[in-house]
Amino acid sequence: MRCVSRSAQDTARWGTVVGRLLEEGSVVVLQGALAAGKTCFVKGLALGLGIQEEITSPTFTLLAVYHGRLTLYHMDVYRLASLEDFFDIGAQECVYGTGVCVIEWGERVASELPEYTVTISLRVLADGNREITVA
């Protein structure tokens, strides 16, 4: 699936659509440059999971946990120096757990993710809009 988002609200709405479709054990990798809208997408995804809490970027905390229809494990692995760091934050329990695991910059730990991982790419277009691709 490929779509174009014309605003932060559009990006969040697309996230909500995806969040409503996710099931227990889903793993989602978000790819995109800095400020491409990854966390904005996760805010919508969380709404689709019935989560009402404020969603913030886990860039410095590395992992945030939210509770809704399913538990959301929101990770940002951009700052991790090694796969060992990925294991140290308890990522394996999140990836192979019963909630939904969303990993920003997840391509950095792709070797540790299941085959059924969904990849969502956000790309900033020349006009400032975002192209969102789900694979």
Curated annotation (Swiss-Prot):
Entry's Gene Ontology BP terms: tRNA threonylcarbamoyladenosine modification
GO CC terms: cytoplasm
Residues bound to Mg(2+): T39, E104
Keywords carried by this UniProt record: ATP-binding, Cytoplasm, Magnesium, Metal-binding, Nucleotide-binding, tRNA processing
GO molecular function: ATP binding; metal ion binding
Ligand binding (ATP): A35, A36, G37, K38, T39, C40
Subcellular location: Cytoplasm
Pfam family, one: TsaE
Protein's job: Required for the formation of a threonylcarbamoyl group on adenosine at position 37 (t(6)A37) in tRNAs that read codons beginning with adenine. Is involved in the transfer of the threonylcarbamoyl moiety of threonylcarbamoyl-AMP (TC-AMP) to the N6 group of A37, together with TsaD and TsaB. TsaE seems to play an indirect role in the t(6)A biosynthesis pathway, possibly in regulating the core enzymatic function of TsaD.
Family recorded in the similarity comment: Belongs to the TsaE family.
Name used for this protein in its record: tRNA threonylcarbamoyladenosine biosynthesis protein TsaE
Gene: tsaE
